[in-house]
Amino acid sequence: MNGNSKVHTEENKNEHQQEGKGGEQEQEQINKHINKDTINNNNNNNNSMSMEMDINSVSVNSLSEPTPNEQQNNNNNNNSNGNGNGNDETTSSKTTTIINSNPLDTDTIMHLNNNDSSNNTTTTTIPRQSSSSIQNGIHKEENINQLTEIQLQPSLQIMDKEQQMNGIEESTTIATQTTLPTNNNNNNNNNNNNNNNNNNNNNNILEKESNGVQEIEDSPNHLSLKRKLMILEEMGLISDDNNKNNNNNSIDIPNSNRLNQIPSSYKTSLYICLYPIGYAIDNIYKDKIFTYNDKISKDFLNSISQGKLTPYIINILDQLSEQNDQKQQQQQQQQQQQQQQQQQQQQQQQQQQQTNNIYQNSNEITYYNGCIVVNIKDYRGFAENEQIAKTFNSKNMKPYPITVPIGTFKEFIEKRIILKPTMESLLFDIKKNCSTLNNDNKNNNINNINNINNNNNNNNNNNNNNNNNININNNNNINNYLNIKESEIVNEEYLLNFEKCLLHAITPQLELSVNPNCFFDQLETKQKQLYNQSHSLFSYKRFKPSDFIGLKYPVVYNNNNNNNNNNNKSYNNISNNNNNNVSNRFIKTHSISNIQERQQVNNNDLSTISTQQSPPTLIQTSAKRSIITLNTQINTTNSCLPNDNFSLFKFLNSNPKWVNERKSMLQYHSNINQTQSFPFNYQFNNNNNNNNNIPVNNNNNNVITQPPFGNGINTFSIKPSIMTKIPIECEQLNGRLLQFFSTSNLTVLTFECKAKPTGYELLMYVSETTQVLNTLISLRNLKFTAPSTSTSSSSSSGGTTTTTTATGTTPTTPTPVPLTQQQLIQQLISFSLNKPILPLNQQSPLAEASYVLDTQLPQPTYLSFPIGNSKQAHFLINHMKSCIEHEGHYILSYDSSFPDTISSQAQEIRKKAEYIHNQQQLNQQQQLQYHLQQQKQQQQQQQQQQQQQNQQQQQQNQQQQQNQQNQQQNQQQNQQQNQQQQQQQNQQNQQNQQNQQQNQQQQQQQNQQQQQNQQTQQQQTQQQIQQNQQQPTQQIQQQNQQQIQQNQQQLQQQQLQQQQQQIQQQQIQLQQQQIQQKQLQQLQQQQQQQQQQQQQQQQQQQQQQQQQQQQQQQQQQQQQQQQQQQQLQQTRNLQPQQIQTQPLQQPPNQMAQSMISPQSTPSTSPSPQQQYQTTPVLQAGVQPQSQLTIKQPIQQPLQPLQQPQPQPQQQQQQQQQQPPQPQPQPQQFAQHLQQQQMQRPQAQLQPPQILQQLQQQQQQQQQQLQPPQILQQQYQTLQPQQLILQQQIHEKQNIHQQMLLQQQRNQTNLQLLQQQAQQIPPNNPQLLQTNQQQQQFVTQQIQHQHQQLLQSQSIIQQLQLQLHQQQQLQQLQAQLQQQTSPNIIQQQQQQQQQQQQQQRIN
């Protein structure tokens, strides 16, 4: 303790606790009032004032509560007032207190002395914090008349692993306290109450030390384990299930590893359907089709086929996310309205909800490490209806979107593709993110101003209630706002917002994770199993981390030792309470495993700190953190790893080693005299003291002293001294430039500090090259060389003047400007960031984004940060510099304040990057030259081709003229020929008509002749009947025989004429049926033989019947002779009457039917009247000899009729036309003959002759029995032949159908090849050649198949002819069997009767 008087500051806290429903967290809002305590001292020591704040260890929603003793002191202090002097640089009325919740670290007390020109000093007693917390204090520059309170938002803290295991929990609170100035009349009261306040504070400190560790659990500033778990849940790093299993105060946080999941579980973000006429995007434009011919659609599909996530697709996905948000809001409103409706509409609501859920699931967007899954369905060639297919395949469709009928396409080919981001998409993403952040910052600034005004009013009201002597006017409120704006402290809230914006801007949001090969390997294997490569619509490419960016220096990662998971990055929200409207792909959180592992290494390394003869370099300090190897051939397994990734919570974590490294880096990169290179709280003097040891570890109270740093200057063991004045270098921040290189994606960050009337502003430019810095330097030089066109404005904070040049705004007065400067200014002004995103129907945003490598101006992608006054700007710039350097992926390449102190590593990387850039430029120049040469050659070739084409066109024109003349001549000739042909055809038609008329006349004549013949026959028969009645019986028989012969001859002649006509008509058919004629001839001969046999059989039957009748007659005659002898006299007169009456008992039709054979044709059969007229011939007495003579001539004229027989088809037709005729009755005729024989004398019988005849008849019957057996054998052989032919025909028909299907497939393939040939650009002759070759091959296959089809048709026709012939033969045989079967039965019966007769005769 020094001899200076002590001043103890006190706190006054008003607690407001609100308990929410459902177990919500308690919210504490505390208004802090700090009174001013000053003591006038006579010491003239020149000391500097410094205030330190703890950023790395901050509690969440917990502030220090006052003890009862402190509350009494606060009540006493409410009536006191502080000294307030009106001088600017002599007095200061601000004090800050940092209250520590851990009583173990209260041994050391730091002294901050402030020596004003009026010898008035204010000191504050601040308990030392642990080594885990590093204090970053901020000095206020001016005397403040009135200050208000600033409410702090809660920050987050992640504990060390050792602290979590041992159960030791620490937290500190930062309280930026302000005081209100009062009148100078109350200064004495403050001086009187200082000693009492100091004593109370000392008593409180001693009480805490005596309680020890037990005070930790009961202290209100303590951050409990439950609260830590709640914070981790809000961050998304731990689930609710882990809260239940919290034994031994340990936290098990699972690492999110999405890449180890099954590829099928990944959700698709875009659904694309390919139709014959165009494509559709089902997520956004449902049932609408876009054409393939548009440039936008070509770029869109090409990017998908190449697997690239372009900025155009990002815009589409953003539109989709916006639509999803709107749909959710609409659905919520609809649900509220639907609940009020009746119960009858519940069914409709369920259906609507089902459909809405389907659309919601399909519209969700999910990013997997910056990648998207796209689902493609190809419906081309799978239309259900032919009409719909024709409409879609037609080329006369309208260009605007059309609606697709539902259910038209059912079959499709499906494929899933992954899109990865490119360099253009990364830059576009940063640009879009920066634009959203700028809009958010503007809104936040407005809200902060309103909050400050409200806080000022509340504080003023509280002070009026406590202090009756204070009266504040409205003018004082305005002065308060201005003073706060000028001297605003860089508090915790502002620092967090600054780091968030910096994190979003620096990190590439769409960069892939640690080991993406697992994801793509799994997906590739699944796609090979599920889908054939032949059906692939787009060329699938295997993605690698270095492919999509084209890096010369790929990022190499390593697996963690403690955790087996390969991936530690997860794209989740940092917290659900963020108001920034940023999508999931913009936010990237990190797992805690890296932080815990880093803390173990740091705690082990702190104990082995040794003396350093020279400052540590970047390579030495970052060797154990994250070195990104630049060698492209290093394997992923043996590479150095980033054990600590850049995170927002890194700055809040208690890690003293990182702070020490930052100090050493800052000291190494700056000279000792240039103190402005350090942050404000790290500026020290050369005063050496002995009691300046800082504890490093919280668990052990061992104090590690660090040796001095070069030239006897200590950095860690030096007591900080108070600074009376800020150096000029700190205030001259306008135009400061910083540049950083990226090692992961070769982006360049350039920062520029500009002065404005309200304060300083930091601009960040994102580009691909280093030329942005050169343009800014050239603009800065032009600003100084140009005439004075700027307006000067003095900053109210520190009295320094800042100038605003014409680079950002237009000049107020017209001044002559050189051409170079004017061009640069116009080009700078022309850039506009807030441009609208174009929809689908307009051009893509890539056309507007000017990502040109050779531009000499800053890119339009920038981000602005309001920094504040000179002190705040100086602090934040150095803070930003250290953050980016420690992040690992960016290295400092240029600093305008220290251009010569750049690290060796940065110089090497810069040289390599410049070398690569120069090589790229050379390659581009060579490519340009090569392209120019090719273009010249192409132009020359095109000119030659055009000349050749012109010549060919002239020749073609001449040929066309000749062809036209030839065509005209040919047309005339064709017309003449057609006329002649028509005339000939007319003549032929006339002749045909005449011939037809003649034929009809001939047929009529023939019919008339037939009628006349019939009439003549009837007349002749009538005449013959009359003559027969008069002539004797013998003459009548002869005449009858002659007439029968004549009739038969006439009938034969008529049949021959008809057959000749039929033969003439069938000559054309006989040529095709030569194979059948032989078989038909054989069958005809068989039929003739069968007919002859049948006639012989009939004759034998008649003879047998006659013999039987004769025997019966002999018996009767014997009986009659005996009777006659007895009655001769009585019966003499009656005998002639009996002889006449007995033959009349027979029917008259029997004799006529017996005279004609049963096989006679229907045309020759007489009518029943004619038959009845012929019966009187047999009424007279007939002798027995005439029976034999009658049957012999009947058989002779029937034989020539059997030779010319009509074909079976004609016979069937004639049989259908003929009416049914009565069959002959041979039995009745036989009975009639028997009665006649009974009347004859017995002397006329000759038994030997009868026996001979019977033997002949038996031989004939045996011969007639053979043909039916032969017919049965032939009938049985024909059936298996027909079955064999039918099987052969069936097999040939199946083969024929398969060949037709193959021909149709080849035709469809040819159509597809023709469509592809139309889509192929003319720049690819190789593809055209391959396509033409494929078309030729397909056409050859089609021709070959056509020939095979013709051959198979001919074979099938031949087989069908054979089968038809066999069927006809089978029908003929069936008919013959039907005719022969009844004859055979009769023959068998007759044979039995004959055998009986022979037995009787013998």
UniProtKB/Swiss-Prot annotation:
Biased composition (Basic and acidic residues): 7-29
Region (Disordered): 1-29, 60-107, 114-133, 177-206, 786-817, 1136-1174, 1199-1250
Bias kind Low complexity: ranges: 73-102, 183-204, 786-812, 1136-1150, 1157-1174, 1199-1218, 1226-1250
Bias (Polar residues) ranges: 60-72
Family per similarity comment: Belongs to the SPT20 family.
Record's protein name: Transcription factor SPT20 homolog
Annotated organism of origin: Dictyostelium discoideum (Social amoeba)
Classification lineage: Eukaryota, Amoebozoa, Evosea, Eumycetozoa, Dictyostelia
